[in-house]
Amino acid sequence: MLVCVSLLILIHSVPVSPVTVSSRNPKVEVHEFSDAELSCEFKTEKDTNPRIEWKRKDKEKDVSFVYYGERFVGPFQDRADIEGATVRLRRVTQADAGEYRCEVSAPSDSISLGETNVTLRVLVPPQTPSCDVPSSALTGSQVELRCRDRHSIPPAVYTWYKDNRALPIRHPNATYTVNEFTGVLIPQSHYNPGTVCQHCMYHPNYHIPNTQLTTTFQTHDLNVAAVVSAVVLVCVILFLCAFGVCLAHRQGYFSRHRGRSFWIPHCHGVTHISSQNLNPSEHTQHSGYSHPPKEPQDFKHTQSFML
């Protein structure tokens, strides 16, 4: 009996070393189109040939296999190698970014499963930024100068230049507002930024080369003399038009016809009959000539002229 108890105590006193999995670099950051090493190290208690699997969780939280059944699957078949449990990916892109998990399964161990996570971040250098800058503006008007790059990772940091001198982000007497993270420059209404503005981007923490774009922005003062001349010219034109209308009215070009007129439709057009044709007697009174009376019932020839 004492022997059994001693054996049990001895078994429980022996330290058990279950499978352990770890990574030398749990957060990996590499430039786009370079190689990435996903470190995975393990120790087992008894099993000398454990099963190794790699899985990946993308930005949409979808889980897929990277290494399964002692071979790479999916898009990693021809551009990945494994040594022990460490995976090396060649020419990584933004599509490869995400969270990777290394799983080691040792059925012979008391604790048969161990895992560790490795996060891969692919850095994208800044490209030539898109520019939203008006070519010119009137002095005193409110404008916004924008510079942005939507593809750089991490997000770009922007610096604006005036006459090849960087504009300070924070200045007590600044006549502008600059947001280094959004790339927006808002000059104040009385600020003249000059004729040339240069803006660039940089990543000071990741040693990515600067990318810059130069553009031209000009301010023009309002031409008061031209505005006054235009107003005077419009007033002169309106005065001449009014004077011409009054003169034409005095000359009778706008007087109405006093006689009445009637329009009678014809077969092939319209016949116009005036009031003078309807009342010939009124017209002949002024001419001094009257027609002789006619007797429609007893018509006789009359002698019109005396010889």
UniProtKB/Swiss-Prot annotation:
It holds the Pfam family V-set. Residues 19-226 are extracellular. Residues 278-307 are annotated as: Disordered. Residues 126-225 form the Ig-like C2-type domain. Residues 278-288 have a biased composition (Polar residues). It is found in: Cell membrane; Cell junction; Cell junction, Tight junction. GO terms for biological process: cell-cell adhesion. Residues 1-18 form the signal peptide. Residues 248-307 are cytoplasmic. Its main location: membrane. GO terms for cellular component: bicellular tight junction; plasma membrane; protein complex involved in cell adhesion; tight junction. It is a single-pass type I membrane protein. Residues 19-112 form the Ig-like V-type domain. Keywords: Cell junction, Cell membrane, Disulfide bond, Immunoglobulin domain, Membrane, Repeat, Signal, Tight junction, Transmembrane, Transmembrane helix. Disruption phenotype: Morpholino knockdown impairs myocyte fusion during myogenesis. Residues 292-301 have a biased composition (Basic and acidic residues). Belongs to the immunoglobulin superfamily. PANTHER family: JUNCTIONAL ADHESION MOLECULE 2A (PTHR44663:SF3), JUNCTIONAL ADHESION MOLECULE B (PTHR44663). Junctional adhesion protein that mediates heterotypic cell-cell interactions to regulate different cellular processes. During myogenesis, it is involved in myocyte fusion through the binding of jam3b on neighboring myocytes. This is Junctional adhesion molecule 2A.
